[in-house]
Curated annotation (Swiss-Prot):
Spectrin repeats lie at residues 272-378, 381-494, 500-602. It comes from the Eukaryota. Belongs to the SOLO family. The gene is sestd1-a. It comes from Xenopus laevis. InterPro entries: CRAL-TRIO_dom, Spectrin_SESTD1. Keywords: Repeat. This is SEC14 domain and spectrin repeat-containing protein 1-A. Transmembrane segments: none annotated. GO terms for molecular function: phosphatidylinositol-3,4-bisphosphate binding; phosphatidylinositol-3,5-bisphosphate binding; phosphatidylinositol-3-phosphate binding; phosphatidylinositol-4,5-bisphosphate binding; phosphatidylinositol-4-phosphate binding; phosphatidylinositol-5-phosphate binding. SUPFAM superfamilies: Spectrin repeat (SSF46966). The keyword Repeat applies. It holds the Pfam family Spectrin_SESTD1. May act as the primary docking protein directing membrane turnover and assembly of the transient receptor potential channels trpc4 and trpc5. Binds phospholipids.
Length: 696
C-alpha cells in the first residue's frame, strides 16, 4: 500500500505504532478515539497500512492494542473492538480499553465483552489511564498514558514517505542498471565502441538515490540509538518498522550495480576519445604555429603615454583571448591523453605520448611568449601610470606654490605647511617609484630580443629606451624646481607660524595679567593678625608682583618680535594696535592695585608692631605718662587703616574695584577694632593708678 495515496488519512492519526513494546516484546498499537465522528473505513485503512509494516517475525510475537476511549462513546469503542478481529492478525494477545473517569454502565460493558469473548479470540480489559502501567512498562507508553516514550506522528510519517520513495526509486534504478550492464557484457564489439548516448543513461541520477539512501540510513541509525545522551530512547522506525536491513541491502546492490555502470561508461568513453584527440591536437598545433605566432610578431611597442600603453594592452588581451580558447582545448586534450595513458592500453601508448609531447612543446612556447609580452606591457602601463600621477602631483604642488599665502592664524599655517611637506614627500616617493618602474622596464626591454623570431627590433627598442629615460629626466627637473620653491615657501610659512605664535602668546600674557589682577582683588585681602603674619604677606605680595612683572615683560618682548616679523613678511600685525593697549591697560591697573595693597600692608604692619609693643610692655607709673602719646598714635593708625579698607581702588578710566567682598572687609575690620579696644583698655588701666595717687 502506497503511503502517498492514503496520506490525508494517515495525517489524522487514527492509529499509530509508537515503537513501544509490551512485556512479551510485542508491538503496541494505539487507537486514539478523539471524537464520535471517527470513520471506521478510514480506521480500517490505517490499521491495514500499519500492520503491513512490521516483519513476520515481529507479528508472530503478537500485538497489544490500546483503545483510548476517554473522549468517545461506548458504542464507538465497542465497534472498534469488534472490528479488530477482522483487521488485526490472530496474534493479538491483549486489547486494553482506556475508560473515562465517568465510566459507562459496568454491567452493560462487562456483559458485552463477555458475550463476545469466544468470537473475539483475544482478551479485552477495561482500565483507567493512570493504571495502564500495570500491564505495560511506563517507558513503553507515550505521554498521553503517563509514560515517557516520545512519539512525533508527523515526523514518523515524513520519514516513512522518504523510506517508501527511496525503496521505489532504488528498485527501479537497479532494474535499469542491470539492463545497461548486462547489455554491455553481451553486446558486440561495434556496440561497445559506440559512445554513451541517452539509451545508456538511467532515468534517475544514481548519486542522488545513493545520497538519499545514506541519509535515510543515517537517520534510522541515529534514532535507534538516540538515548545514548541521557534522553529517553525512542525507536519507532527501527528494523521492525522500517526494515532497516532492507535499506542496507538496497544500498549495497545500488553501489555494486552503479560501480559496474561507471566502469562500462568509462570503457566506452575511453575508446571513443582517441580519434577525437588526434584531430584536435593537429588543429591546436596548426593555429598556434600559424596565425597565433604571426599576431605576436607584429606587436613590439609599449606606447609613449598611459593611454597608448592601455591601447597596446587591450590589443594584447584580444590576442590572449584568442589564444585562451586554444589553450582551453589544450588543457582538455592533455587531461584526456593522461586519462588514456593511465588506462594502460599498450597499442595506444606510443602515439599518445608523441601527441602529448608535441602539443605541450608548442603550447608552452606560445604561452611563454604571451606571458613575456603581458609582463612587458604591464610594467609599461605601471610606468606610465606612475609618471602620469607624478606629473599631476607636480602640477598640484606648483599650483600651490604659485598662490600667495594670506596669513589667517597659526593653526591654518601649520596645516598648510604640513600639507606642503606631505605633497613634497609624496613627490619624492612617486619619483623613486618612477625610477624603479623605469629600470624594470628597461631590463625587460633588453630581454625582448630573445622572442623576436629572427625579427630585428633594435629600432623599436631604442625608441622605447629613449622615451623611458626622457620621462625620468623630465620628472627629475620638474621636481628640483618645485623643491627650490618649497624651500622659499617653507621659510616664509615658518615666519608666519612664529608671528602668529608670538601674537597668541602675547594675548595669553594679557589673559594671565588679568587673572593675576583678579586674584589680587579677590584672594589677596588678608592683612594679617599680627606683625609677623603681615610681614609674611608683604613678602608674598612682592613675589606675586615679580611674577606679574615678568609676565608683562614677556608680553612686551613678544609684541616687539611681532613688529620685526611683520616687517620681514611685509604685513601689518594685528597685535600692535590691539594687544599692546590691552597689555598696558591691565598692567597699569595691576600696578595701581598692587601699590594700594602694599600701602595697606605697610599700615597694618605699623599698626600691629606698635600695638604689640604697647601690649607686651609693662611700664611703671612714671613712664606711663610719657607713653600716652603712643597710645593715641596707635589708635589713630588703626582708625586710618579702617577708613582705608572702605576706599575702592580707582583706575585711570574711572572704574572702581574693592578688595574682596563686604564680608571679607568686615572680618578684617573687626580684627583691627579688637586690637584698638585692647590698646584703649591698656591705656585705661594705666590711667586708674595715676588718679588714685593724686587723690591720696
Amino acid at each position: 500500500m502506497d503511503t502517498t495515496t492514503i496520506l490525508p488519512i494517515l495525517k489524522k492519526k487514527l492509529a499509530f505504532l509508537s515503537g513501544g513494546k509490551d512485556r512479551r516484546s510485542g508491538l503496541i498499537l494505539t487507537i486514539p478515539l478523539c471524537s464520535d465522528q471517527t470513520s471506521m473505513d478510514e480506521l480500517s485503512v490505517t490499521l491495514d497500512y500499519l500492520l503491513s509494516i512490521p516483519s513476520e517475525k515481529c507479528k508472530a510475537r503478537g500485538f497489544t492494542v490500546i483503545v483510548d476511549g476517554r473522549k468517545s462513546q461506548w458504542n464507538v469503542v465497542k465497534t472498534v473492538v469488534l472490528m479488530l478481529q477482522n483487521v488485526v492478525p490472530a496474534e493479538v494477545s491483549l486489547v486494553c480499553v482506556v475508560k473515562p473517569d465517568e465510566f459507562w454502565d459496568k454491567k452493560v460493558t462487562h456483559f458485552c465483552f463477555w458475550k463476545e469473548k469466544d468470537r473475539l479470540g483475544f482478551e479485552v480489559i477495561l482500565v483507567s489511564g493512570n493504571k495502564l502501567t500495570r500491564y505495560i512498562e511506563p517507558s513503553q507508553l507515550t505521554e498521553q498514558f503517563g509514560g515517557s516514550l516520545t512519539y512525533d506522528h508527523m515526523d514518523w510519517l515524513n520519514k516513512r514517505l522518504v523510506f517508501e520513495k527511496f525503496t521505489k526509486e532504488s528498485t527501479s534504478l537497479l532494474d535499469e542498471l542491470a539492463v545497461i550492464n548486462n547489455g554491455s557484457d553481451k553486446g558486440s564489439q561495434d556496440e561497445k565502441e559506440r559512445s554513451v548516448d541517452f539509451n545508456y543513461l538511467p532515468s534517475v541520477d544514481p548519486e542522488t538515490v545513493l545520497q538519499t539512501g545514506h541519509e535515510l540510513l543515517s537517520e534510522l541509525q541515529q534514532r535507534r540509538f538516540n538515548g545514548s545522551d541521557g534522553g529517553v530512547s525512542w525507536s519507532p522506525m527501527d528494523d521492525e518498522l522500517l526494515a532497516q536491513p532492507q535499506v542496507m541491502k538496497l544500498l549495497d546492490s545500488l553501489r555494486e550495480q552503479y560501480t559496474r555502470y561507471q566502469e562500462v561508461c568509462r570503457q566506452r568513453s575511453k575508446r571513443t576519445q582517441l580519434d577525437e584527440i588526434q584531430q584536435k591536437v593537429m588543429q591546436v598545433v596548426g593555429w598556434l604555429e600559424g596565425p597565433g605566432s604571426e599576431q605576436l610578431r607584429t606587436q613590439w611597442g609599449i606606447g609613449d603615454s598611459f593611454r597608448a600603453s592601455q591601447a597596446f594592452q587591450q590589443k594584447h588581451e584580444e590576442i590572449e583571448s584568442q589564444h585562451s580558447e586554444w589553450f582551453a582545448v589544450y588543457v582538455e586534450l592533455n587531461q584526456q591523453i593522461a586519462a588514456l595513458l593511465n588506462a594502460g592500453d599498450e597499442e595506444d601508448l606510443v602515439e599518445l605520448k608523441t601527441l602529448q609531447q608535441r602539443l605541450s612543446d608548442v603550447c608552452y612556447r606560445q604561452a611563454s611568449q604571451l606571458e613575456f609580452r603581458q609582463n612587458l606591457l604591464q610594467i609599461a602601463l605601471e610606468f606610465h601610470s606612475v609618471a602620469q600621477d607624478l606629473s599631476q602631483q607636480l602640477d598640484g604642488l606648483l599650483g600651490m606654490l604659485c598662490v600667495d599665502v594670506a596669513p589667517s592664524d597659526g593653526s591654518a599655517i601649520q596645516q598648510t605647511l604640513k600639507l606642503l611637506e606631505e605633497k613634497l614627500k609624496s613627490v619624492d616617493t612617486g619619483l623613486q617609484g618612477l625610477r624603479d618602474k623605469g629600470q624594470g622596464l628597461l631590463d625587460q626591454i633588453t630581454n625582448q630580443a630573445t622572442w623576436a623570431y629572427g625579427k630585428d627590433v633594435s629600432t623599436e627598442n631604442k625608441d622605447n629606451v629613449d622615451h623611458i629615460q626622457g620621462v625620468m629626466e623630465d620628472m627629475q627637473l620638474r621636481k628640483q624646481r618645485c623643491e627650490d620653491m618649497v624651500d622659499v615657501r617653507r621659510l616664509k610659512m615658518l615666519q608666519m607660524v612664529q608671528l602668529f605664535k608670538c601674537e597668541e602668546d602675547a594675548a595669553q600674557a594679557v589673559d594671565w595679567l588679568n587673572e593675576l589682577l583678579d586674584a589680587l582683588l579677590k584672594t589677596h585681602i588678608r592683612l594679617g593678625d599680627d606683625s609677623q603674619e603681615t610681614k609674611i604677606l608683604l613678602e608674598k605680595h612682592r613675589k606675586f608682583v615679580d611674577v606679574a612683572q615678568s609676565t608683562y615683560d614677556y608680553g612686551r618682548q613678544l609684541l616687539q618680535a611681532t613688529v620685526v616679523l611683520c616687517q620681514s613678511l611685509r604685513c601689518t600685525s594685528r597685535s600692535s594696535g590691539d594687544t599692546l593697549p590691552k597689555l598696558n591697560r591691565v598692567w597699569k591697573q595691576f600696578t595701581i592695585t598692587s601699590e594700594e595693597r602694599v600701602h595697606r600692608l605697610e599700615m597694618a604692619l605699623a599698626f600691629h608692631s606698635n600695638a604689640e609693643k604697647i601690649l607686651q610692655e609693662c611700664p611703671d607709673l612714671g613712664e606711663a605718662v610719657m607713653e600716652f602719646e603712643q597710645f593715641d598714635e596707635v589708635e589713630a593708625v588703626g582708625k586710618s587703616l579702617l577708613d582705608r579698607l572702605t576706599v575702592p581702588v580707582i583706575y585711570p578710566d574711572g572704574t572702581e574695584q574693592y578688595f574682596g567682598t563686604p564680608s571679607d572687609m568686615a572680618f578684617t575690620a573687626e580684627h583691627i577694632r579688637e586690637r584698638i579696644k585692647m590698646v584703649c583698655l591698656k591705656k585705661q588701666q594705666l590711667l586708674e593708678p595715676d588718679e588714685s595717687i593724686r587723690e591720696s
